[in-house]
């Protein structure tokens, strides 16, 4: 597996039901009814974070997913932690519903809001940088999604259309992502490490593939 030099290769990989993974975190999550449990799903661009987050959310009725890309939209690739903290995580920890519009949404006329409904049992915060050190007081569980860098880039190119503009965006993203993760090292805080490009046979509708050693 091709990875940046500071990131260790995890494994061996094993498939397990998403419900079983959630059960393994029981001691880390708040008691039902107090507030939503908050899970950070972090990983490099194109690693498979969104797919993993969706698998977790499917396993918990009424779970919510917040994508950090929605906070970063027309704001900054990585300098959005205060928006997530103040607009989403602080009210969630107070047991409040969230309907948050980041400043750029108003400035650029984007409709909708970042929503976490009242009574939501689980909030999955998905995105590169979700498990940074500064957000750890608001995260109950951390997942790092690891994928070969070549596979991640190829996946991102397919997702974004493979145009010259998409490639230029990828290069701009990587210019910030590489030093950010070299500093932050979120895999060192991970309760679970998952693979975003599993070669282990599994049912993607119900199972996730995680490192047996983490």
Regions found by a protein language model. Name each.
Residues 87-91, 158-163:
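Conserved AAA+ ATPase "sensor/coupling" helix adjacent to the nucleotide-binding pocket
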Residues 113-159:
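ATP-dependent NMP and nucleoside kinases share a basic, alpha-helical "lid"
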């Amino acid at each position: 597996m091709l990875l940046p030099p500071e990131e260790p290769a995890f494994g061996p990989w094993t498939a397990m039901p998403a419900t079983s993974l959630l059960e393994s975190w029981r001691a880390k999550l708040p008691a039902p009814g107090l507030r939503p449990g908050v899970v950070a799903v972090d990983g490099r661009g194109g690693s498979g974070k969104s797919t993993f987050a969706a698998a977790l959310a499917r396993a918990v009725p009424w779970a919510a997913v917040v994508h950090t890309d929605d906070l970063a939209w027309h704001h900054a690739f990585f300098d959005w932690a205060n928006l997530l903290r103040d607009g989403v995580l602080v009210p969630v920890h107070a047991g409040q519903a969230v309907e948050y519009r980041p400043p750029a949404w108003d400035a650029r006329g984007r409709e909708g809001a970042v929503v976490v409904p009242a009574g939501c049992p689980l909030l999955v915060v998905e995105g590169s940088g979700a498990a940074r050190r500064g957000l750890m007081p608001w995260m109950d569980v951390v997942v790092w999604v690891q994928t070969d860098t070549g596979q991640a880039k190829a996946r991102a190119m397919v997702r974004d259309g493979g145009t010259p503009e998409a490639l230029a965006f990828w290069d701009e993203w990587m210019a910030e992502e590489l030093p950010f993760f070299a500093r932050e090292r979120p895999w060192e805080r991970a309760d679970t490490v998952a693979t975003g490009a599993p070669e282990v046979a599994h049912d993607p509708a119900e199972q996730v593939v995680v490192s047996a050693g983490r």
